[in-house]
Structure formats: structure tokens, C-alpha cells
Amino acid sequence: MKIRVGVIGCLGRMGKKILNELITNTKVEIAGAVARSGSKYIDSDIGPIIANLGIKVTSSISDVFESSDVVIDFTTKECMLDCLKAAVKFKTPLVSGTTGIEGVDLKEYAAEVPILWSANMSVGVNVLLKLVKKAAELLGNEYDVEIWEMHHNLKKDSPSGTAIELGKTIANASKVDFQSNQYLHSGSNIRKKGGIGFAVSRGGGVIGDHSVMFVNSDERIELNHKAIDRTTFARGAVQAAVWLYENKREIPGLYSMQDVI
């Protein structure tokens, strides 16, 4: 039996990539696809998006959660909240890569149903997270930490969810409080000692570049990741969905790509 996977936000850049990954993965099949209400594709076959599979695009999140073994969401904070409620109602595991979700208590929903959330589904970025954690543990607080990220000119959240996740990982490894030690460079103030600095760039169609620097007066250690194609995020999301269903479908909890890899 193949794993039935629903996709929320099927017309978005990530949604289309995920659909394409699903049709090439032998472990899964597409159970349903959701687009926002009012889309011209509602009640049409997903054929114009990827391939004629006899699956119609719907605006009903509930219908897709009810008919799926696991659901993948890459949408907005508002839509993700609807997904979380549906996941709890139908006890359907949820994988989400939606960012900009400040104020959402994922643990509250994860107490009822398995939820896997990551700011970045790329295997490479999750390897980077492990590397910066190890570097922070080895270097302690003797190095200034700087995180720089660049994305396309339409990205709304800043710094990116991935950059924040990198910062939190470093703070935890260094045994410092992230909230009181992180800051976004601005104005003419000198650098905060012991702080985790963030710098942000937006331009063109950049998919996602992240750089973490550990710097003292003698040397600089730099760890980088550059996304070349969004397929890396889609492939990771499908991998996460398969892992969540095969390993945790009956075990409520909050998981991440760090658990998958």
C-alpha cells in the first residue's frame, strides 16, 4: 500500500515542486491537492499543474486531511492554523514548512497528533544545522557569531526562518538565551559582545543563501549553504512525510528534519 499524501498550497512554487516529487516517488501517491478559494483551478484536474491523475483541486482542507495518510503544507500562517486544526480533528500527521508563524504554539497541537515542522526541509541545511551546533560547542563564547541570509525580493519574513533556526541552534549549544542575545544590525551602534548578529539581503530570484561566521581577532570560520533549486526543499518534505508516517503516525509529538536525517 502506498502512502496517501495530501498537499496544501498546490499552486504555489513549493506546492508544484512537491507534487512533482510525489509522482516520482514509488512509496507515495497523491491523495488530494488544496488551492485557495476562488482559484480558477478549483474542481479541475491537477493535470494542468503536473499530470492527469484523476485528482481534482479543491479548496477544502478538511476533505484532504480526511482522505490522506499524511499532509504536507507550505502556505501562510493563517492557512497553517487551519491545517493544524484539521490535523487534530482527523488525527492526520502533518508536515509543514510554513514560516513566519510567530505566536503559533505547535506543541499544543502536537500533543494530539504527529507534527513535523522545519523552517527548511533541505537535507543540506539540516546538515549545516548539525555543523554549526558542533562548532558552537567547540568554540564556546569566545567568537563573535554572525548569520547572513539572502532570498528573493518577494520574501516577507526577515530574518528567514532558517536564519533564526541557525541562531537558536548556536544559542542552545553555547548555553546562552537566544532572545536576549540576538539582534539585527542597524544604526551606528558597535557590535554587542556575545551577541548573535543577523544581516539580511533581498534581491532578484535568489532561492536561499545562508552563511554562519564564527569570528575572533585571529581567524574566521565560515559555514555556507546555497540552494540551487527548490526541488531540494520538495524532496526533503516528501522524505519527511514518508518518515513521519512510517515511524510516528501513532505517536503525537513535535518533530523536525533533524529527526529525519
Swiss-Prot record:
Could you tell me which pathway this protein works in?
Amino-acid biosynthesis; L-lysine biosynthesis via DAP pathway; (S)-tetrahydrodipicolinate from L-aspartate: step 4/4
Q: Which residues bind NADP(+)?
A: 36
Cellular location(s)? Cytoplasm
Keywords in alphabetical order: Amino-acid biosynthesis, Cytoplasm, Diaminopimelate biosynthesis, Lysine biosynthesis, NAD, NADP, Oxidoreductase
The active site is formed by: 151 (proton donor/acceptor), 155 (proton donor)
Residues where NAD(+) binds: 9-14, 97-99, 118-121
Its recorded reaction(s) are: (S)-2,3,4,5-tetrahydrodipicolinate + NAD(+) + H2O = (2S,4S)-4-hydroxy-2,3,4,5-tetrahydrodipicolinate + NADH + H(+); (S)-2,3,4,5-tetrahydrodipicolinate + NADP(+) + H2O = (2S,4S)-4-hydroxy-2,3,4,5-tetrahydrodipicolinate + NADPH + H(+)
Judging by the UniProt lineage, the source's domain of life is Bacteria
Please cite one Gene Ontology biological process associated with this protein: lysine biosynthetic process via diaminopimelate
Q: List the Gene3D superfamilies.
A: Dihydrodipicolinate Reductase, domain 2, NAD(P)-binding Rossmann-like Domain
Specify where it is mainly localized: cytoplasm
Its EC number is 1.17.1.8
Q: InterPro entries of this UniProt entry?
A: DapB_C (IPR022663), DapB_N (IPR000846), DapB_N_CS (IPR022664), DHDPR_bac (IPR023940), NAD(P)-bd_dom_sf (IPR036291)
Binding residue positions for (S)-2,3,4,5-tetrahydrodipicolinate: 152, 161-162
UniProt-recorded Gene Ontology molecular function terms = 4-hydroxy-tetrahydrodipicolinate reductase; NAD binding; NADP binding; oxidoreductase activity, acting on CH or CH2 groups, NAD or NADP as acceptor
Q: Name one GO cellular component term.
A: cytoplasm
Described by its record, this protein's role is as follows: Catalyzes the conversion of 4-hydroxy-tetrahydrodipicolinate (HTPA) to tetrahydrodipicolinate.
Q: Which HAMAP family match?
A: DapB
Identify its protein family.
Belongs to the DapB family.
Q: What is this protein called?
A: 4-hydroxy-tetrahydrodipicolinate reductase
Provide the taxonomic classification. Answer: Bacteria, Pseudomonadati, Pseudomonadota, Alphaproteobacteria, Rickettsiales
